[in-house]
Swiss-Prot record:
Keyword tRNA processing included in the entry's annotation: yes
Catalysed reactions, as listed in the record: guanosine(37) in tRNA + S-adenosyl-L-methionine = N(1)-methylguanosine(37) in tRNA + S-adenosyl-L-homocysteine + H(+)
Name of the protein: tRNA (guanine-N(1)-)-methyltransferase
Family that this chain belongs to: Belongs to the RNA methyltransferase TrmD family.
Gene that encodes it: trmD
Keyword S-adenosyl-L-methionine: yes
Record localization: Cytoplasm
Alphabetized Pfam families for the sequence: tRNA_m1G_MT
GO-annotated biological processes: tRNA N1-guanine methylation
Keyword annotations of the record: Cytoplasm, Methyltransferase, S-adenosyl-L-methionine, Transferase, tRNA processing
Record-level GO cellular component terms: cytosol
CDD domains: TrmD-like
Organism field: Anaplasma marginale (strain Florida)
Enzyme type, top EC level: transferase
């Protein structure tokens, strides 16, 4: 699995991606990171990558010609790469989308800055636009890290216990509550069903709690799974 990241701040990577499970997988060669400095494709002595938008307006836009040279260099080395632009205008990034992206094997993530990029870049190269949520952040680098982390977790060999992937939140509802020792803490006890050692009862409880939490907090996930919203209580 190869991720090419196009950014004007290459030193931000690998950043958090160099730690824990994803970082270990990077060191083991289960995935690779190719960071490309967009500024190196600027044509002037100041390495200018942005300019004022036509028609006026606040801020600056990343230039199409500079981005084009950068993208072309990646396509020359990786002609089959999937082009993804992290943008607030994009389709919401989901677990399902993460699975789809992983199948491409080679992903190029363009990290926008300033007020975004010249729209012609998206159109000419047919970028898939992806948003990590309905909020604004300073640039696309953090969004790219979120996408990479989510995708890398599904690469074979990265997560040791395959059950961890199938039981995670968003597969078909939110994850059930989990507890560890001590059995009682600050007057709050672990549910008895989890202490009895009956695996069937535990699974039933987990399914029930997953459903209840999803109905209360994210009923839209149940619709995506083909479920119906029903009133429930934790009894």
């Amino acid at each position: 699995m190869i991720f090419n990241v196009l950014t004007i701040f290459p030193d931000m990577f690998p950043g958090p991606l160099g730690y824990s499970t994803v970082g270990n997988a990077l060191r083991k060669g289960l995935w690779s990171l190719n960071v490309v400095d967009i500024r190196s494709f600027a044509s002037d002595k100041h390495s200018t990558v942005d300019d004022k938008p036509y028609g006026g307006g606040p801020g600056m836009l990343m230039k199409a010609d500079v981005l084009g040279r950068c993208i072309d260099s990646v396509l020359e080395a990786h002609p089959d790469t999937r082009l993804v632009y992290t943008s607030p205008k994009g389709k919401q990034f989901t677990q399902d989308m993460s699975r789809q992206i992983v199948h491409f094997g080679n992903i190029t993530l363009l990290c926008g800055r300033f007020e975004g990029i010249d729209e012609r870049v998206v159109d000419v190269y047919n970028f898939q636009e992806v948003s990590i949520g309905d909020y604004v952040i300073s640039g696309g680098e953090l969004a790219a890290m979120v996408v990479i982390d989510s995708c890398v977790r599904m690469v074979t060999g990265v997560i040791g216990n395959k059950d961890s992937l199938t039981r995670e939140s968003f597969d078909c509802g939110l994850e059930y509550p989990q507890y560890t020792r001590p059995a009682s803490w600050k007057g709050v006890s672990v549910p008895d069903v989890l202490l009895r050692g009956n695996h069937k009862e535990t699974e039933l409880w987990r399914c029930k709690m997953s459903r209840i939490i999803t109905e209360r907090r994210r009923p839209d996930l149940l619709k995506d799974c083909g479920g119906e919203e029903e009133g429930s209580s934790n009894e």
